[in-house]
Amino acid sequence: AIIPGFAVSAPVERKVTREKISFLTEESAVTLDFHREQPDVPQHASYTVLRNRLDPWLMEQAEQAGAQFIPGVRVDALVREGNKVTGVQAGDDILEANVVILADGVNSMLGRSLGMVPASDPHHYAVGVKEVIGLTPEQINDRFNITGEEGAAWLFAGSPSDGLMGGGFLYTNKDSISLGLVCGLGDIAHAQKSVPQMLEDFKQHPAIRPLISGGKLLEYSAHMVPEGGLAMVPQLVNEGVMIVGDAAGFCLNLGFTVRGMDLAIASAQAAATTVIAAKERADFSASSLAQYKRELEQSCVMRDMQHFRKIPALMENPRLFSQYPRMVADIMNEMFTIDGKPNQPVRKMIMGHAKKIGLINLLKDGIKGATAL
């Protein structure tokens, strides 16, 4: 473990014991609810966190290990001697280093200035907006059917992103919930609503409104996230420099779960291991730092990025976010409607709704989904 005893000492919010996935239309929700007791081994469990609490704690751990932080300073440019990166420039100040690790987020201007990160493809990015809404621990436990320090993670497809590529999310914290949505950057230009309006409509959905009733808005934020998968991973190593985290495109949206922080941490660990080895060799050239790529290939980072490389193309299918949520809701509505008319066999009911999408489309999408996952 990078930080032994992390789950015991870190300011985590709740241990996730309930995972939900919902297909939403404007007026309905079809939900898959999975509940389990998390393992007794803390490092095998899943936790919710709030970055404004976790990040300062992480900074303290790094400082105790010998790192020095200079917060609130923007890096304006990279310092180079020939082809080698030798430091960073912040205003009039220059900080020199044997190796610079770029972790400047999904829109890595520093990586782009070196020619390592190519020009942006809008389909490789999504815009996320989030509200942190304060509730009492008792309200959270009652509304999400959890107890003690248990938590819930909930993903939504369909109406939250107005039928476009994206979806909603909800995570329970100790005394608040994190509620938001993401929408593909390439789709925003064609959207009928603005992203803030999508979030407001999401909050008013019949499945969401009771969960946040009486809550107090504590925080509002927006963030751009990578969605391109393996196809957007840039050149990771050059003379005196490496790229990690979102800047390297290390994020996986699998539909049923979203992974970003774990891949960012694992890539940073691989970079740190590489720097330590390079220092022992007194060699910070690109060929020496190429160990970083080998470390990534041996870790979960590149293995999972490679395994799920077809997911981004799957997520570009508009039927996943419009027609399929509607089809599932219509089938469930018909199954549970008693109107005095003879009931159809369920197979005929399903087939009738499936034909609206097209059996060929269903077959193609099913095969594509199976191969992607």
Please provide the spans of the model-predicted regions.
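Short coil/turn segments at secondary-structure boundaries
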Residues: 7-8, 143-145, 213-215, 305-312
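Predominantly flavin-linked oxidoreductase catalytic cores and closely associated redox partners
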Residues: 52, 56-213, 250
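Active-site-proximal substrate-binding core of FAD-dependent oxidoreductases
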Residues: 251, 270-322
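FAD/FMN-dependent oxidoreductases across multiple families
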Residues: 158-165, 174, 187-269, 283-294, ...
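N-terminal FAD cofactor-binding segment of flavoenzymes
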Residues: 1-28, 303
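Helix-loop-beta segment of a Rossmann-like dinucleotide-binding subdomain
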Residues: 30-51, 182-185
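Alpha-helix N-cap/helix-initiation motif
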Residues: 43, 47, 51, 85, ...
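C-terminal auxiliary extensions adjacent to catalytic cores
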Residues: 314-373
